[in-house]
Regions:
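An aromatic/glycine/proline-enriched structural segment found at the starts
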Residues: 185, 189, 193, 218, ...
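Mature N-terminal segment immediately following signal peptide/propeptide cleavage
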Residues: 32-60
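N-terminal export signals
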Residues: 2, 7-24
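Sec-exported extracytoplasmic/periplasmic mature domains
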Residues: 87-92, 104, 108, 135-146, ...
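M16 family metallopeptidases and their MPP-like homologs
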Residues: 51, 56-80, 96-141, 171-198, ...
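Active-site SXXK
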Residues: 77-91
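Cleaved targeting-peptide boundary
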Residues: 24-30
């Protein structure tokens, strides 16, 4: 599972929304870097960051590749995710299935994830074993075997994963259809990361090997080390194990522009497997890397004040009045391309879809017409920055957030000084961002309903 900087901080900010005392008493120094990461690049193009962490004698390695589901070839959705699975099927130094076994033997753990923008592999071990995991990861980066004899069995694993997580889950099916309705079924942002079933079945070893050859190069990767190891030792070991990998030109993300309108502006799905209705609405929106980038940080503040838990406008108007069981918003500005600003709500039993949708639209319209209050903006920023400090408590948060930021092409300062940047957002900027996106950006409104 991928947790972006926004998702990591948003989960902590939600805790602050539920507990105002935390937000009041946890304010970050405005110009102090969150992690104090050291940052350099090897001669072959590999970007490296190191985050000291001395609370426990452990170390973690995150290796991000700037290629996710959005980079899947046309007609082959799911290649990036399928390759993630096949990367555990051996390399010149590591036998099939031995990677995780060797990490576990040292008392560590490992995993991987694929998102729309990146594929990442990570391990955590006792600090003295850093060299071991660097050597193993560098080996499969340079020369993963991707053996043909394991292709069909792993395809079965991927298809079973899709069956369990999506096909047998009415809400997951609905959300998948909703994303495709907004962007288009074959647009890079509209395809599921795991892939459409028919396209998963068509993926060949050549597809996987070609993706590896194109994207799994040092100049297309970001390595983040966090832990209780001296910096000079980290530099020595990284250069020893990764420095010899042949340099290749970085692959460019080749993505179509955002469509001028939603593929399906309105989507209604009835499902006999669902009991509770679900309302979704999403707008295409700029990010920190695409579109009107100046709106990205204000949109983060807007998302929190509009639907960031208790005290937000949607919670007050929909949940506290008894119209909805839950209501919230989401926005991920940390994206390598255009992204979405979305709203979700579940009506209480007895509340009609029409009534809930009308109330939600009224909240949006009022915000567009009147803008947020200074108090709302200040409260949202206070909770978001407090959430940033709470996120520092987790051992893996730093490498995950730093790596995810660098891998989409943003500078290190974008995450290190995020509290200061978000604190500088003004009420007028939030109002301008809301008016730039909510009234006119391509959008999709959708309902999942029980069978009639």
């Amino acid at each position: 599972m991928r947790l972006t900087r926004r998702q990591t901080l948003a989960s902590a900010a939600a805790l602050c929304a539920a507990s105002p005392a935390i937000a009041q008493n946890t304010a970050p120094p405005p110009q102090r870097p969150l992690f104090g990461a050291q940052h350099w690049r090897l001669a072959n193009g590999l970007e490296v960051a190191f985050i000291p962490f001395s609370r426990a004698p452990v170390v973690t390695q995150y290796l991000f590749f700037a290629a996710g589901g959005a980079e899947d070839p046309a007609g082959r959705s799911g290649v990036a995710h399928f390759l993630e699975h096949m990367m555990f099927k051996g390399s010149p130094k590591i036998g099939v299935g031995d990677f995780s076994r060797l990490v576990a033997r040292e008392g560590g753990n490992d995993n991987a994830f694929t998102s729309r923008d990146v594929t990442a592999y990570h391990q955590a071990v006792e600090a003295s074993r850093l060299g071991m995991i660097l050597e193993m990861e560098a080996d499969r980066m340079a020369a993963a075997l991707i053996p043909q004899e394991f292709l069909e069995s792993e395809r079965g694993v991927v298809l079973e994963e899709r069956q369990q997580r999506t096909d047998s889950n009415p809400r997951a099916r609905f959300r998948e259809a909703f994303t495709a309705a907004l962007w288009g079924r074959q647009h890079w942002a509209g395809r599921p990361i795991i892939g459409w079933e028919d396209e998963i079945r068509a993926i060949s070893r050549d597809d996987l090997a070609g993706f590896h050859a194109r994207f799994y190069a040092p100049a297309n990767a970001t390595l983040v080390i966090g832990g209780a190891v001296p910096e000079d030792e980290v530099r020595r070991l990284v250069d020893k194990h990764y420095g010899g990998i042949t340099a290749r030109a970085a692959a460019r993300r080749d993505r179509a522009p955002a469509p001028s309108q939603a593929a399906e502006p309105r989507l209604i799905r009835r499902d006999p497997m669902t009991r509770d209705a679900l309302f979704l609405k999403a707008w295409m929106a700029p990010s920190l890397t695409a579109g009107e980038r100046a709106h990205a940080l204000p949109l983060e503040v807007l998302s929190h004040l509009l639907g960031g838990g208790q005290g937000s406008r949607l919670h007050k108007v929909l949940v506290e009045t008894g119209l909805a069981v839950s209501a919230g918003t989401g926005y991920d500005g940390d994206a390598a391309g255009m992204t979405e600003f979305y709203l979700s709500a579940m009506p209480r039993p007895g509340v009609t879809p029409e009534r809930l949708e009308e109330a939600a639209n009224a909240v949006i319209e009022t915000l567009i017409q009147q803008g947020p209050t200074e108090a709302e903006v200040a409260r949202a920023i206070r909770q978001l920055t407090a959430g940033a400090m709470l996120a520092l408590d987790g051992f893996g948060a730093g490498p995950r957030m730093v790596g995810g930021t660098l891998a989409i092409g943003l500078p290190l300062d974008a995450v290190e000084f995020w509290p200061a940047r978000i604190s500088a957002v003004t009420r007028d900027q939030v109002e301008a961002a809301a008016r730039a996106v909510l009234p006119s950006a391509p959008s999709c409104t959708a309902w999942l309903l029980p069978a009639a």
